[in-house]
Design a protein with these regions (language model features):
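Flexible, charged surface loops at secondary-structure boundaries
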Residues: 28-32, 82-87, 393-394
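Short, well-ordered loop/turn and helix-capping segments at boundaries between secondary-structure elements
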Residues: 104, 123-127, 144, 184, ...
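Phosphate- and divalent-cation-binding pockets in alpha/beta enzyme and binding domains
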Residues: 100-101, 278-279, 411
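Conserved "right-hand" nucleotidyltransferase catalytic core of DNA-directed polymerases
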Residues: 1-19, 41, 49, 172-386, ...
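Function-dense linear segments that define catalytic or interfacial modules
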Residues: 56-61, 65-69, 351-447
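Active-site-proximal helix-loop-helix substrate-binding element of RNase H-like nuclease domains
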Residues: 2-17, 46-187, 195-199, 205, ...
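Entry/capping segment at the start of metal-dependent catalytic domains
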Residues: 21-50
Length: 471
């Protein structure tokens, strides 16, 4: 049975499977449910700019659809609903999305299970058919139930008509059964701790995404201007290198003088990989490298290709400096200030759990079509004080900065039970990468570990690559 909580009384009696319900009855009945499915319908993906339209709460027997925008005393109702849900296990599919909207209205569930995360834990980064971890996919997989998504989005122009209400209710009807089916698989493979951890963590991630980061805009503008000036200077050095080389100037300099008596222009766009490939091939460089996606060989001006050959021509180091600065300007430049949210005044990104690598990631694309943007990666901020000093806490607050020391390597030692690694950590041996280098390279063997980092940088780097290749 579907029970609608709304002041839109015109719906009353129009269909036998949907009945009106008072707020008091809904709150009382939900308080008796130890496990509930929870879902939302919204006008978009942004909890600050978009509106919450409905909240669905229920189980296989009864589903409550709350017409969020058309209930009286909404704030008071949300406070009471939040108190009730504190004692319930709330099951979501893609919990992070719904939690971000619910947090905005004072609903903060304590005990959460996400069937989306539950499914990702089961296939643990292995190749997986696209769409199989959607609600529609897991309902079909475990329950042989088809959830019709054809009416998705109709709520925006039809409102809460019966087919939209049924669609919204369906999203919570089967969540408990899906969770139970997943839990059997988790138990079989000893995944209970992972499931518990990830479902606790998703509550935190939703909160962190809503909090965002505060940016000192005046200081950021100064940084951007300084970075752009450095980039312009590097481009001028590249152009001058062409002008000063008789062979290169003959081929790559426009012989026609500027109408206003300026310098002759250079016929290379240093920001164009295609043009730069042609240029460096003309210098006799080998630009071939394997494409990560196709596995086929291709020409590239990637730093990995050019660095080993930089001794072949003085313009190569200049170009590498230019490309590095260009990345700084494009990745850590005005795109940041452009993404400061008009409502919160902060930068927001998206975090994703349970990647193939086992790590957390952030960033990715947001929006559609021309409005699509590349979100900022909060997990890849350079160790540059000019940049980091622009990220500031609120007035009267401080940042707390913490990090695990060699987290992956500790796990490797624990899982492998390698005696030398275990002994190293039990004795608080210091830098693991230097320790491994001392085992691999004879020249490092009798050198104190704290000196290997400075005296044998390459050997330590090789050892580090070895450690992370395994861990």
């Amino acid at each position: 049975m579907i029970r609608l909580i709304s002041n839109q009384t015109f719906i009353e009696g129009t269909t036998p499977d949907i009945e009106s319900c008072s707020i008091e009855d809904m709150l009382w009945e939900i308080s008796l449910m130890p496990i509930v499915g929870v879902d939302t319908e919204t006008t978009g993906f942004d909890p600050f700019n978009n509106r919450l339209l409905t909240i669905q709460i229920g189980n296989r027997d009864v589903q409550y659809v709350i017409d969020f925008e058309c209930i009286r005393h909404r704030k008071d109702v949300m406070i009471r609903l939040n108190r009730i849900l504190q004692d319930s296990l709330c099951i979501f599919h893609n919990a992070k999305f719904d939690l971000r909207f619910l947090y905005r209205h004072g609903i903060v569930p304590k005990n959460v299970y996400c069937t989306y995360l539950g499914e990702m834990i089961i296939h643990q980064g292995l190749p997986y058919e696209k769409g199989r971890d959607s609600l529609q996919g897991v309902a079909m997989k475990y329950l042989d139930v088809y959830i019709d998504k054809e009416v998705r989005g109709d709520i925006h122009w039809k409102g809460l008509v019966p087919e939209v209400i049924r669609y919204a209710a369906k999203d919570v009807e089967h969540l408990e059964d899906i969770m139970n089916a997943q839990t059997e698989i988790h138990a079989k493979h000893g995944l209970h701790k992972t499931v518990t951890l990830e479902n606790r963590f998703v509550r935190v991630l939703a909160y962190i995404e809503n909090c965002g980061m505060r940016l000192d805009l005046p200081r950021w503008e100064e940084k951007c201007l300084a970075d752009e000036k450095v980039l312009q200077a590097l481009q001028k050095q590249l152009d001058d290198a062409i002008r000063q080389d008789p062979g290169l100037s003959q081929k790559y300099m426009d012989r026609q003088l500027d109408l206003f008596g300026g310098e002759q222009s250079i016929l290379i766009n240093w920001s164009s990989p295609t043009q730069c490939v042609k240029f460096f091939k003309s210098l006799g460089l080998d630009l071939s490298m394997k494409d990560k996606e196709t596995g086929e060989m291709k020409d590239s001006v990637d730093a990995k290709v050019l660095l080993p050959q930089q001794h072949l021509h003085p313009i190569i180091p200049l170009y590498l400096d230019f490309k590095g600065q260009e990345k700084t300007v494009s990745t850590y430049g005005r795109n940041w200030s452009d993404q400061v949210h008009p409502v919160t005044g902060r930068l927001h990104t998206s975090f994703r759990q349970l990647l193939n690598t086992g790590r957390l990631s952030s960033g990715g694309k947001a929006g559609n079509g021309r409005n699509q943007i590349q979100l900022i990666n909060f997990l890849n901020i350079p160790q540059d004080n000019n940049l980091r000093n622009c990220i500031i806490p609120d007035e009267g607050k401080l940042f707390i900065d913490s990090d695990y020391s060699g987290q992956e390597s500790v796990v490797l030692a624990n899982q492998s039970m390698e005696p030398k690694l275990i002994s190293f950590y039990n004795e608080d041996g210091g830098d693991l990468h230097s320790f491994v280098a001392s085992l691999l390279y004879p020249e490092c063997r009798d050198v104190p570990l704290d000196e290997i980092k400075t005296k044998f940088k390459q050997q330590r780097q090789n050892a580090k690559a070895c450690n992370f290749a395994i861990a």
